[in-house]
């Protein structure tokens, strides 16, 4: 299935690229989410006519993501969880907990933007967490996990 991308898609292509994808990926994700349109002559002509509009929208989204990344630069948050005397948490601190903690201190963050490479935290300590705010914008923040008896 050939599609024209209306925005940048990680590991696939950039705005305006004509890509070939498996039919299920195109029908079930790219087309319903408005990320791509079928690569027909009419759609190609319509895309060329609106290309400047799409590029302006992509630039504004990138600028907004960079502004958010600047707010997160050097930010840290403390998350409290029940822990044993050895420092092991009785549960874990995951992406949802981190997103809620940042939102509580006035830095809105969604769970899907938090990247935990090695899974949820199960020990007390300080961790560096990657935030994926846009396809081209990432930021690193510090999360301090404190234990409460």
Swiss-Prot record:
The gene is rplI. GO terms for biological process: translation. GO terms for molecular function: rRNA binding; structural constituent of ribosome. The keyword RNA-binding applies. Binds to the 23S rRNA. Gene3D superfamilies: Ribosomal protein L9, C-terminal domain, Ribosomal protein L9, N-terminal domain. HAMAP family: Ribosomal_bL9. Keywords: Ribonucleoprotein, Ribosomal protein, RNA-binding, rRNA-binding. InterPro entries: Ribosomal_bL9 (IPR000244), Ribosomal_bL9/RNase_H1_N (IPR009027), Ribosomal_bL9_bac/chp (IPR020594), Ribosomal_bL9_C (IPR020069), Ribosomal_bL9_C_sf (IPR036791), Ribosomal_bL9_N (IPR020070), Ribosomal_bL9_N_sf (IPR036935). One of its GO terms (cellular component) is ribosome. The keyword RNA-binding applies. It comes from Xylella fastidiosa (strain Temecula1 / ATCC 700964). Pfam families: Ribosomal_L9_C, Ribosomal_L9_N. NCBIfam families: L9. Belongs to the bacterial ribosomal protein bL9 family. This is Large ribosomal subunit protein bL9.
């Amino acid at each position: 299935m050939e599609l024209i991308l209306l925005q940048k898609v990680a590991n696939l292509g950039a705005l305006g690229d004509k890509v070939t994808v498996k039919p299920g990926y195109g029908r079930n994700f790219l087309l319903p989410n408005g990320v791509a349109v079928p690569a027909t002559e009419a759609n190609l002509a319509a895309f060329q006519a609106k290309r400047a509009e799409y590029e302006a929208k992509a630039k504004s989204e990138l600028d907004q993501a960079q502004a958010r990344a600047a707010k997160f630069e050097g930010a840290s948050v403390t998350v409290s969880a029940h822990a044993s005397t050895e420092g092991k948490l009785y549960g874990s601190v995951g992406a949802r907990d981190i997103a809620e903690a940042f939102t509580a201190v006035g830095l809105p963050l969604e769970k899907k933007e938090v990247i935990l490479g090695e899974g949820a935290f199960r020990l007390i300590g300080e961790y560096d967490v990657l935030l994926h705010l846009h396809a081209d914008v990432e930021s690193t923040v510090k999360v301090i996990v404190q234990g409460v008896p």
